Design a protein with these regions (language model features):
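Compact, glycine/acidic-enriched structural inserts
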Residues: 106-146
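A surface-exposed partner-binding patch
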Residues: 1-106, 112
């Protein structure tokens, strides 16, 4: 049995334990092996696809968001760079997408109708995608993912 690493433990310190969890089938883990970072697949195996902070942040099944990601990227240059998969989302429709070729990620902000990406970075192969996944979770901020009353 694997244990949580310090990066995911730090994420949980900020967001709390999952408030909802779907166990990830081994077939899904196998389907994304070699496509998404091994560390993310290990988080799926340990934690499932889950909601944190009462649904403020979710780890998700990329297949559930593939059509939405495709619609958002249609007509942009991003599909020419890589094939992207949604790995997480917020309660308010911000999607975090991961590229399978270069192992770089960016944000699709549905509520503000923008894609936030460092284009030059997207063309560079990430030498340590597992470290990037750990950093993604460790650096996550519940405050930054919440929307204030307007």
């Amino acid at each position: 049995m694997s244990v949580r690493d310090e990066d995911f433990a730090y994420f949980l310190k900020k967001f709390g334990e999952a408030t909802y969890t779907d166990k990830v089938p081994e077939s899904s883990i196998q389907k994304f092996k070699g496509i998404l970072p091994d560390q993310l697949l290990e988080y799926w195996r340990l934690e499932g696809w889950s909601a944190y902070a009462n649904g403020l942040m979710w780890t998700v099944n990329p297949e559930d968001y593939s059509d939405l990601v495709q619609q958002w990227l249609e007509g942009t240059h991003y599909p020419k760079i890589d094939k992207y998969h949604c790995i997480a989302r917020t309660a308010f429709g911000v999607l975090y997408v991961w590229g399978e070729k270069y192992n770089q990620w960016f944000t699709i902000s549905c509520p503000t109708n923008v894609i936030v990406a460092f284009d030059k970075k997207l063309f560079n192969v990430n030498p340590d995608p597992d470290h990037s996944i750990k950093s993604f979770f460790a650096s996550a901020s519940a405050k930054a993912r919440d929307l204030k009353d307007l």
